[in-house]
Amino acid sequence: MPNWVFNHLTVKGDSKDIDVVKAQLNSPFSKEHTSWNPKTQTLDTSTTMYSNPVFAFWNIVRPDDLEAYHKTPEHTIGQPANEMFKGNDWYSWNIRNWGCKWDVAIADDNHFIDTSMDELKDGGVQYNFDTAWSPPSEAIEKLSSQHPNLTFKLYYEEEQGWGAEVEYINGEGKVILEYDDRCHECSEINSMDYCDECGCNVCLKCKMNREERACIHG
């Protein structure tokens, strides 16, 4: 299982421009998927429908060479990171163009039920979704360049506690806040320190550990 990154993307600007983004991201599409069949010892191909994807990296940028995209990734153990994702297989292409391993679009079988959109009181919208291992920085950068009149803010936090807030305007990202850890109790950033007595990380401010129990040694 991957480490998950929890993302919140706000989009603000003129309501007509926001409506264009909403329509783009929620545009219906279909994709072919391959999976290994242990009974037949072959790869099975199936088509997945996305009638109401809500938010889809596929609707921001998609590969031109679908034949190459659907090939099985060929990565070698110990291969340098800068050489791992040069191919056009789905894994390499996704990492290069989206910044993360998988899309977050909601399929008709509700595979990604954690993806949602909220209307904000100021007229903007917020998308909420989870990505594997890393935030979708490349995808949001491309989306921002496609809509230069809108302001995109990506808030993300990995399940171990590191995260950031990045603002995108006209394809340019600016880091507003970046941290290595955050206390889930008091929200203090970069405040976690290892306690030998507790055997876990404890917030230096509120003395709570990751399990949200008070550290008696603080």
Where would I find each of the regions flagged by the language model?
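Long, contiguous binding/interaction regions
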Residues: 1-182
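Intrinsic disorder/low-complexity signal
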Residues: 16, 184, 192-196, 210-211
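Short glycine/proline-enriched coil/turn segments at helix->beta-strand junctions
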Residues: 148, 191-192
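Short cysteine-rich clusters marking metal-coordination/redox-active sites
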Residues: 183-186, 195, 203, 215
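Zinc-coordinating Cys/His ligand positions in small cysteine/histidine-rich zinc-finger domains
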Residues: 189-191, 200-206, 212
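Short, intrinsically disordered terminal segments enriched in charged and Pro/Gly residues
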Residues: 210-218
